[in-house]
Amino acid sequence: MKQYIKLIKKIIRVGNQKKDRTGTGTLSIFGYNMKFDLKKGFPLLTTKKCHIASIIYELLWFLKGDTNISYLNENKISIWNNWANESGDVGPIYGKQWRNWSTPEGHEIDQIKNVLIQLKKNPDSRRMLVSSWNVGDIDKMRLPPCHVLFQFYVFNNTLSCQLYQRSCDVFLGLPFNIASYSILIHMIAQQCDLKVGDFLWTGGDVHLYNNHIELAKKQILRIPRTLPKLTILKKPQSLFQYCFEDFKIIGYHPYPAIKGEISI
């Protein structure tokens, strides 16, 4: 993924040194775009090994509408443990907003299901968006959403998606985000009998934490390898019935992992 390496190099070259909520400090740029053609391979980072199980289980967790980490922990995924309360809840984050957005009238809106309906009945719609940024719920969230809004687009029976990410931890978070939304595009395309197109990513505050800069410099010395391919082994009756075993990553040959500390 040469685009990812190019982004790291730009942050190191022209980034602004900023303070942040965690106290770690960041090297930051504002506004950045990348585009991945999913027909040319699955954009899973090869310059360091990514934990595929965490990416897939987290996405399935979001799609369940779940906001308790028990499902993740049962599957040996700990990426949300630092933000959960004593009962394992992380507040009304992604899953809640995607599947059960609360209205002032007391109703709940399933944004994902609504998008699926539009994709099948009116694929030219410009209203196929999902938002995680529910202003009325922000103070109840243990960690407000970083990837906040995504929109689908269909042309020539091909599905594309654009994501806006307000805050992006480039070293630890971004590789997960790119892979996760690319998997989601594959899943929805399969459910709607569409081909996969492009994943477009837009970042707002795009940053390297100060304690990741030297790790990132090590990573950019590695030459990106051929992207793997994602295969979905079966087609469930519903988007919400996929399980971890349905996904197979073929030809993933990354460099060794580079571990970095997470800023909380």
UniProtKB/Swiss-Prot annotation:
What Pfam families does its record include? Thymidylat_synt
One GO cellular component term noted in the UniProt record for this chain = cytosol
Q: Which domain of life is it from?
A: Bacteria
Principal cellular location given in the protein's record: cytoplasm
Task: Please state the Enzyme Commission number of this protein.
Answer: 2.1.1.45
Q: Where is the active site?
A: 146
Could you tell me the keywords of this UniProt record? Cytoplasm, Methyltransferase, Nucleotide biosynthesis, Transferase
Residues that bind dUMP, according to the entry? Answer: 21, 126-127, 166-169, 177, 207-209
Q: Does the keyword Cytoplasm apply?
A: yes
According to UniProt, the reaction catalysed is: dUMP + (6R)-5,10-methylene-5,6,7,8-tetrahydrofolate = 7,8-dihydrofolate + dTMP
Q: Which InterPro entries match?
A: Thymidate_synth/dCMP_Mease, Thymidate_synth/dCMP_Mease_dom, Thymidate_synth/dCMP_Mease_sf, Thymidylate_synthase, Thymidylate_synthase_AS
What would you give as a GO molecular function for this chain, any one? thymidylate synthase activity
Localization per record: Cytoplasm
- Provide the disulphide bond pattern: none
GO biological process terms, semicolon-separated: dTMP biosynthetic process; dTTP biosynthetic process; methylation
Q: Which HAMAP family match?
A: Thymidy_synth_bact
Q: Which family is this protein grouped under? A: Belongs to the thymidylate synthase family. Bacterial-type ThyA subfamily.
Describe its partners and assembly state.
Answer: Homodimer.
What's this protein's name? Thymidylate synthase
What taxonomic lineage is listed for the species of origin?
Bacteria, Pseudomonadati, Pseudomonadota, Gammaproteobacteria, Enterobacterales
